[in-house]
């Protein structure tokens, strides 16, 4: 009798799982068709945004395009949040989970010439971080999900953020009452990365290394030459794992290297300390030693000031020492919720080609993302979406002079993440 009960339970469970799997597949197939139907219009939007890039806190034209597009879809729209921020609210036909999706809108100052035919018309400004693509993908997701309204349970919030490049936009929107307007249970977002177009990368916890500047204050009458030499020796002794030969770009170029990069289990980017520079400065009557570095381990980040202070107090400079502290952060790393990362990965894998979902095993250096400020309020996951196409000569490494994105990435982004949001909104 017990065996029969177990077999019956297994059959019922299998049936439920298969039904859910079939539902996921059906929804995704419908989303694929809807995305295909709007793809050419999305490419036009992306190219228009690329031709007319706007710097941080100047995204008026972009935010107007976004707001008009969302209104035409029938969404409730809020504007001028934290500056040029826009929020679109899509309410489903039934009650369910509330899911937020965030995209950034600003461009970057650069004198490097554009590498695409639809070149920037704003001199010295380009979208070389892919925010034009991020914005377009988010609009595409909003379009597709508005067509799925009868299948949507819960509410989806679309956050279009200004000033990501200055690391102020998220904080500005939050300070201006963003979370009074929206009440998400989960939040998601993405950034274009150097993998092949459509490849999704994700990992739990930190995506990037922590970028910190340590400031040590000394009395003014200290022997500056000896002090700088002493402090340089301390911080150089902290360096580990990654070779310091070459420029930062030499290290960054290894990120997508299949042998040592982030998608390899034996990646060199798992555990490291990279010293970006250390120097002595004098301000008024005080002497400061400033050291900037990248560190993967938050415990090490927290313990370093105490370790360095101990070495100073054990040295001949102990009587000159005044204080040690971290300077204000202008960068940081998203901190992906482990449980949501697992669930989101499994959900995407249920309808997306398996080889297109590649886990990460390390933390990228030299990058920052203010998406982390949303994650301090709501559990969430931040993804990388590959945009490169080697055969076409397209390399989507952010902030590089030849940055470009294969526009099929827009289609992949809309399809996969619209399906993810739908499944998460409808989840119990």
Where is each model-derived feature located?
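His/Asp/Glu-rich mid-to-C-terminal helical/loop segments that flank catalytic regions of hydrolases
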Residues: 225-244, 385-428
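Active-site-adjacent substrate-binding region
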Residues: 236-270, 331-387
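Sec-dependent N-terminal signal peptides
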Residues: 6-14
């Amino acid at each position: 009798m017990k065996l029969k009960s177990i077999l019956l339970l297994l059959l019922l469970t299998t049936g439920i799982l298969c039904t859910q799997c079939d539902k996921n597949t059906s929804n995704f197939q419908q989303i694929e068709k809807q995305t295909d139907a709007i793809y050419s219009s999305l490419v036009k939007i992306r190219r228009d945004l690329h031709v007319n890039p706007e710097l941080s806190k100047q995204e008026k034209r972009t935010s107007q395009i976004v707001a008009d597009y969302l209104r035409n879809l029938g969404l409730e729209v809020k504007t001028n949040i934290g500056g040029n921020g826009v929020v679109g609210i899509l309410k489903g036909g039934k009650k369910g989970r509330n899911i937020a999706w965030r995209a950034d809108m600003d461009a970057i100052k650069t004198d490097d010439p554009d590498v695409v035919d639809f070149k920037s018309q704003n001199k010295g400004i380009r979208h070389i971080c892919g925010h034009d693509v991020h914005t377009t993908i988010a609009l595409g997701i909003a379009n597709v999900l508005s067509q799925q309204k009868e299948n949507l349970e819960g509410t989806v919030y679309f956050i279009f953020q200004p000033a990501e490049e200055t690391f102020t936009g998220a904080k500005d929107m939050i300070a201006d009452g963003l979370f009074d307007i929206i009440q998400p249970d989960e939040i998601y977002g993405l950034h274009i990365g150097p993998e092949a177009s459509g490849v999704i990368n994700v990992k739990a916890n930190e995506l990037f290394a922590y970028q910190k500047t340590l400031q040590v204050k000394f009395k003014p009458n200290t022997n500056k030459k000896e002090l700088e030499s002493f402090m340089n020796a301390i911080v150089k002794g902290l360096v580990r794992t990654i070779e310091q030969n070459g420029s930062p770009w030499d290290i960054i170029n290894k990120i997508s290297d299949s042998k040592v990069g982030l998608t390899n289990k034996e990646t060199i980017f798992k555990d490291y300390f990279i010293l970006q520079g250390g120097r002595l400065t004098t301000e008024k009557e005080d002497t400061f030693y400033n050291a900037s570095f990248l560190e993967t381990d938050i415990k090490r980040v927290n313990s370093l000031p105490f370790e360095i202070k101990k070495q100073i107090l054990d040295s001949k400079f102990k009587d000159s020492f005044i204080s040690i502290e971290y300077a204000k952060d202008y960068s940081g790393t998203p901190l992906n919720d482990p449980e949501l990362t697992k669930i989101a990965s499994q959900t995407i894998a249920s309808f997306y080609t398996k080889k297109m979902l590649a886990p990460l095993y390390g933390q990228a250096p030299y990058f920052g993302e203010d998406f982390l400020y949303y994650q301090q309020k709501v559990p969430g996951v931040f993804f990388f979406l590959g945009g490169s196409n080697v055969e076409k000569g397209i390399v989507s490494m952010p902030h590089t002079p030849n940055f470009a994105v294969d526009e099929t990435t827009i289609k992949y982004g809309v399809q996969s993440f619209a399906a993810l949001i739908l499944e998460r909104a409808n989840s119990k």
